[in-house]
């Protein structure tokens, strides 16, 4: 879960959490909890984020570089 939080933070970059949350249609509080490792991501939200960044799910969860 920590690898996902670190990768997500790096991908979000300078974009505000609220703006990113709006773009991927995931509540801001949920994104914040992912970044703080307080909530495990659902498969549907993982797919939304992977699609948005055009990244492989394995990369997002830290299974490959």
Across the structure, where does each feature detected by a protein language model lie?
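Short, Lys/Arg-enriched C-terminal cap helix and immediately downstream tail that follows
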Residues: 11, 43-44
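A short, Lys/Arg-rich alpha-helix, primarily the initiator
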Residues: 1-19, 23
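DNA major-groove recognition helix of helix-turn-helix/homeodomain DNA-binding modules
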Residues: 44-59
């Amino acid at each position: 879960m920590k690898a996902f939080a670190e990768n997500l933070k790096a991908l979000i970059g300078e974009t505000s959490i609220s703006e990113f949350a709006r773009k991927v249609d995931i509540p801001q509080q949920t994104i914040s909890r992912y970044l703080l490792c307080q909530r495990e991501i659902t498969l549907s939200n993982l797919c939304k984020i992977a699609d948005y960044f055009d990244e492989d799910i394995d990369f997002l969860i830290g299974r490959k570089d």
